Amino acid sequence: MKRRTLLGLGILALALGLTACNGGKEKSAQGDSKQEADSGKGNEKANAKANEDYFEWMGEDSIANLNEEGSKQKVIVIPKRAKSFDSGLGPDDDVQLEELYFESDDDFQLGYGLTLLKKVKKIVLPKNQTSEVDVQSDHNLESLDIPAGVSSIAKFGFRDCQSLKEVNFLGEQLKVIPDSAFLNCSALEKISIPNSVESIEEAAFQDCKSLKEVHMPKNLKEIGSGAFAAAPVDSYYFPKEIENLKVLPDSFASTGKGNFYVVKDSWLDKNFEDVFGILGEKQYYDGE
């Protein structure tokens, strides 16, 4: 009887051990699957491959357009062979492109190549991009990082990017936000302008209907005609370093009376009425 009891206990222990082992394997498999899924997040470029056969080429290293097969692709990586766009990838209604990457991190001559892409939601520019950026009329583009080396964006460079909510400037090389650069970016909610910028030109942020918060650059010298016209900004932040700022009577036309935050005892604090008149309400902040 004692032997039977011991034998029964042994079998039970073995069964429990096997169950625990299988459960551990299942958890391990689930963990491995989750790790694989997590490692894929934000790594779309690694999962896509450059294919030179998706393009029509002009010479050895310039892309003229997408061919029929390329137009069907939702994700495209520009091959490292390419150095420039000869024309543009759009605006053909048959172009299905939603995400665009570059195989090389080297500077790329964009020209008008990334404009009028009606369905594109995501563009990742080369890390070492320095040439001018122009993505106007990319209606579904949601965000864009401007690489640190970029020193200019085109006039009308983001015009009519109506889904654009976020622009991140990763460096401080820009001197000018040019004419109509963000005209009618109706989803843009907030922007921090690089401290290197000295001039915000005519209609730069006009008709940005969702824009609520603007952080001005330290080296700002002038704000052009209609720069923020019809943009209902609640809060503008002006760093203490700003001096001798020139503002036109219509720089903030049809915006309502926003809050203009300045640092106490700064040049703008002391000259607020001369610079802004009745354009906005003076408020104070700590400059951070």
Residue ranges, per PLM feature:
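Structural signature of tandem-repeat unit edges
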Residues: 52-55, 70-84, 93-109, 116-131, ...
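Secretory targeting signals
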Residues: 9-15
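N-terminal export leaders
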Residues: 3-7
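Post-signal peptide N-terminal segment of mature Sec-exported envelope proteins
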Residues: 29-58
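C-terminal motif of bacterial Sec signal peptides marking the signal peptidase cleavage site
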Residues: 17-20
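Bacterial signal peptide processing site
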Residues: 22-25
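Eukaryote-biased recognition of intrinsically disordered, low-complexity regulatory segments
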Residues: 60-71
